[in-house]
Regions:
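Chalcogenol-based redox active-site neighborhoods
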Residues: 1-171
Length: 171
């Protein structure tokens, strides 16, 4: 359980509201409240409705001093392609919050939302070891992180269950 604990730090690349690609870390939001939400994959059935719902209510989050970050195990290029796909064709259009890439699944793993992954320890020719993760996606997890970087609220939904944006706003 992560509630009341310091939110795991991350640094990754993200597609920003203006469609630029930038490095983003949780520490960039120090002193701000953050909703960090995970979704399974780009170009899937339920996910666009949730991402669009966050975007539609973004001004309400901002009026409460809350930044919104979305994250999946997809690449920044997949996020960008999804943003550049019309909503009527299964895309998400130009959502106005950052979409974080998590190709190595380290962010999803650190927030304990990764499901269906298989880990393997791989040793290089130089004898150095590394843990790799194959397969797996993020469950629908939502985290409210306070100004000090502490997780104050967490909700985790199984893959077929959508999340309630009103509940995140209520928190």
């Amino acid at each position: 359980m992560l509630v009341t604990k310091k939110a795991p730090e991350f640094k990754t690349q993200a597609v920003m509201p203006d469609n630029s690609i930038q490095d983003v870390s949780l520490s960039d939001y120090s002193g701000k409240k953050v909703v960090l939400f995970f979704y399974p994959l780009d170009f899937t059935f339920v996910c666009p409705t949730e991402l669009l719902a966050f975007d539609k209510r973004l001004d309400e989050f901002k009026s409460r001093g809350v930044e919104v970050l979305g994250c999946s195990v997809d690449s920044r290029w997949s996020h960008l392609a999804w943003k550049n796909t019309d909503v009527n064709n299964g895309g998400i259009g130009n959502v106005q919050y950052p979409l974080l890439q998590d190709l190595d699944k380290s962010i999803a793993r650190s927030y304990d939302v990764l499901v269906g992954a298989k880990e393997a320890y791989v040793e290089t020719e130089e004898g150095e070891g590394n843990t790799t993760v194959g397969g797996g996606v993020a469950l629908r997890g939502s985290f409210l992180i306070d100004e000090e970087g502490v997780i104050r609220h967490a909700v985790l939904n199984d893959l077929p269950l959508g999340r309630n944006i009103d509940e995140m706003l209520r928190m």
